[in-house]
């Protein structure tokens, strides 16, 4: 059986290091960052193993919400739609980008005892902001197909 927590930790660490933006797991990350990601562990599908194999595959879905908030130094400011679109592009590159020459993933996902078999964009609802709100956000959901290594 594949434990979900190590996968979540690995995805958050990868997105943080590759984007140079803080990532909060289900809540705003510590600190006072104006631009950050929220990572949510959503639904998952479990595929039954063949008769000779006791290990199940797992296909979890993770939601990445790119957030751009108001500038604390500027009263009445708001988040920047261009910033969240850049962040969404970066998240897409981190999880789905491939090297054009080799076809290998640009950013490997390393989880002990787990092999990543596939990655895909599950759904991308896009911007979820209210013009009257100072916070701008953009939502994407990624599916990862995992098998025990």
Where are each of the predicted segments found?
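Small/polar-rich, solvent-exposed N-terminal microdomains that initiate assembly or binding
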Residues: 1-54, 98-110
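Mid-chain, well-packed structural core segment of small domains
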Residues: 76-103
């Amino acid at each position: 059986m594949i434990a979900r927590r190590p996968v979540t930790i690995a995805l958050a660490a990868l997105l943080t290091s590759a984007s140079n933006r803080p990532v909060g797991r289900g809540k705003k990350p510590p600190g006072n960052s104006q631009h950050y990601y929220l990572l949510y562990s959503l639904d998952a599908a479990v595929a039954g193993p063949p008769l000779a194999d006791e290990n199940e595959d797992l296909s979890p879905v993770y939601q990445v919400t790119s957030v751009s908030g108001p500038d604390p130094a500027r009263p009445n400011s708001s988040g920047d739609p261009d910033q969240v679109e850049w962040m969404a592009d970066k998240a897409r590159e981190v999880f789905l980008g491939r090297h054009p020459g080799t076809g290998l993933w640009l950013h490997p996902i390393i989880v002990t005892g787990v092999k990543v078999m596939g990655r895909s964009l599950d759904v991308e609802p896009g911007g979820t902001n209210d013009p009257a709100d100072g916070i701008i956000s953009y939502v994407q959901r990624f599916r990862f197909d995992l098998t025990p290594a």
